[in-house]
Amino acid sequence: MPGTASLLDAMHAFATGRADAVVGFAQQPIEMRARKIGQVIVNTTTDRPWSQYFCCMLGANREFVQRYPVTTKRALRAILKAADLCDSEPLKVARFLSDKLYEPRYQVGAEVVKSLPYNRWREANPEDTIRFHALRLHEVGMIKSTPQKLIAQGTDWRFLNELKKELKA
């Protein structure tokens, strides 16, 4: 919403009737539900077609990856191990988030961590996500490249595929 500086401002604008809707990340819908404000229209974690694709992906500069492949793989490994920890021990992760004040409200953090599909990286194909979003962007004229061209020229799944084998559950 124009004139809002933060998600809190956007939520306040919605709660006071100055906005008809608000886009929230994981915490905001939980907070608004607790305050009995509005209702969720689309939940990309559970509603199709969005729920079938990754909400977040890791991007890297091609030159950096070529110059520092070991560092790149280590960073990706750390992120995937963190995702596994979120999946296997959500309450421990929520406590960490609360202790470090990343999400100071333990209950909100716990609900968020438990609600997100952190283990999806093991089974889902990230290429499907790129294809899905590229098709939408291509359809509305925001990108000129085809999904196939974007995937061919802009993705490299080697590290991910290697780590899927290395980090078997």
Regions inferred by a protein language model and the residue ranges of each:
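Short beta-strand-to-loop elements that line the ligand-binding cleft
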Residues: 1-6
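Secondary-structure end/capping motifs
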Residues: 66-145
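Conserved C-terminal helix/tail region of periplasmic/extracytoplasmic solute-binding proteins
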Residues: 138-169
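Pocket-lining segment of extracytoplasmic ligand-binding domains
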Residues: 9-100
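Short secondary-structure boundary/hinge segments and terminal tails
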Residues: 31-32, 49-51, 115-116, 153-159
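A generic structural-conservation signal
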Residues: 23, 41, 107, 146-147
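Short, solvent-exposed coil/turn linker segments
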Residues: 42-44, 117, 125, 149-150
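Short alpha-helix boundary/capping motifs
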Residues: 42, 60, 103, 121-126, ...
